[in-house]
Amino acid sequence: MNVVQGNIESKNAKIAIVVSRFNSFLVESLLEGAVDTLKRFGQVSDENITVVRVPGAVELPLAARRVAASGKFDGIIALGAVIRGGTPHFDFVAGECNKGLAQVALEFDLPVSFGVLTTDTIEQAIERSGTKAGNKGGEAALGLLEMVNVLQELEQQLQD
């Protein structure tokens, strides 16, 4: 049986992190978690990490698409925080953000990790941005590192 799986060390990987400024008090913690994980576990150097800041979560897919189209990156991490309010706005923003980022991954055959918090309350968002429930930015970075390696390994195996 042939099993393809990746590890998380990616010293030479070039990673873009597309970050929403909206709810920045939460998103900055996600960014810190992602960068820390890329450096400590992935051994990714500072010069191989590019941060792109956009106004809100709805702008993440377009920025991610532009990054992917450049061909200069091995993967993209999208970070943001969308918190449910009293209107259906949450559903539109969260849904379109998720769908758009998935489309970028498929269109460009590039790992795009979803580190966008979609929570019902601000307390849930705080818990997921570095307190009780861990740091979802760091988790998104781990998933991305593994997918970068899985796709490289798969490419190599398919050529053999």
UniProtKB/Swiss-Prot annotation:
Keyword check for Transferase: yes
Binding of 5-amino-6-(D-ribitylamino)uracil, residues: F22, A57, V58, E59, A81, V82, I83, F114
Bridged cysteine pairs (disulfide): none
Example GO molecular function: 6,7-dimethyl-8-ribityllumazine synthase activity
InterPro entries: LS, LS/RS, LS/RS_sf
Keywords tagged on the record: Riboflavin biosynthesis, Transferase
EC number: 2.5.1.78
Active site positions: H89
GO CC terms, sorted: cytosol; riboflavin synthase complex
Pathway connected to this protein: Cofactor biosynthesis; riboflavin biosynthesis; riboflavin from 2-hydroxy-3-oxobutyl phosphate and 5-amino-6-(D-ribitylamino)uracil: step 1/2
Keyword Transferase: yes
Highest taxon in the source lineage: Bacteria
Catalytic activity annotation: (2S)-2-hydroxy-3-oxobutyl phosphate + 5-amino-6-(D-ribitylamino)uracil = 6,7-dimethyl-8-(1-D-ribityl)lumazine + phosphate + 2 H2O + H(+)
Enzyme type, top EC level: transferase
CDD domains tied to this protein: Lumazine_synthase-I
Annotated residues for binding of (2S)-2-hydroxy-3-oxobutyl phosphate: G86, T87, R128
Biological-process GO terms, alphabetical: riboflavin biosynthetic process
Function: Catalyzes the formation of 6,7-dimethyl-8-ribityllumazine by condensation of 5-amino-6-(D-ribitylamino)uracil with 3,4-dihydroxy-2-butanone 4-phosphate. This is the penultimate step in the biosynthesis of riboflavin.
NCBIfam families: lumazine-synth (TIGR00114), PRK00061.1-4 (NF000812)
Subunit structure: Forms an icosahedral capsid composed of 60 subunits, arranged as a dodecamer of pentamers.
Family: Belongs to the DMRL synthase family.
Name of the molecule in the record: 6,7-dimethyl-8-ribityllumazine synthase
Biological source species: Shewanella sediminis (strain HAW-EB3)
